[in-house]
């Protein structure tokens, strides 16, 4: 059976990659994300296509990852808005916390995204991440 005949009948979970640019270059990164990528971000149109497809396959929630989605909080907000328009909830946004500078600025970023559907962060912490990002972040 060739790949052209492969059909996904139902999707039970999934993820949307917003970007490949990342402040780290973790040796274990499946997608080879890092600072060598352009700082491009998924367009709202592409996000909408993905959410439409996810919903059509019976999936009502996904996670968001990258790269580092929170390097561009305004664009992340637009993606969260698109998910809401298609009735797709966000399980979590994965982050390496490199964007974190202090509690006050983090609260400002996160409080702006919460009404858009960001309720949970999955913070990546490992020896690979700690090579590039201080554990304290």
Language model feature labels by segment:
Residues 111-137:
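Radical SAM enzyme [4Fe-4S]-AdoMet core and its adjacent flexible, acidic
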Residues 104-110:
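Alpha-helical scaffolding within the catalytic cores
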């Amino acid at each position: 059976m060739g790949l052209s005949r492969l059909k996904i009948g139902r999707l039970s979970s999934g993820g949307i990659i917003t970007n490949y640019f990342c402040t780290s270059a973790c040796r274990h990164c499946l997608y080879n994300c890092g600072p060598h990528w352009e700082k491009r971000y998924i367009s709202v149109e592409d996000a909408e296509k993905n959410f439409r497809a996810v919903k059509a396959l019976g999936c009502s929630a996904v996670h968001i990852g990258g790269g580092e989605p929170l390097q561009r909080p305004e664009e992340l907000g637009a993606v969260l808005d698109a998910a809401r328009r298609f009735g797709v909830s966000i399980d979590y946004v994965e982050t390496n916390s490199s964007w974190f500078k202090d509690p006050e600025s983090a609260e400002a970023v996160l409080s702006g995204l919460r009404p858009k559907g960001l309720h949970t962060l999955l913070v990546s912490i490992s020896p690979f991440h700690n090579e590039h990002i201080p554990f304290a972040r």
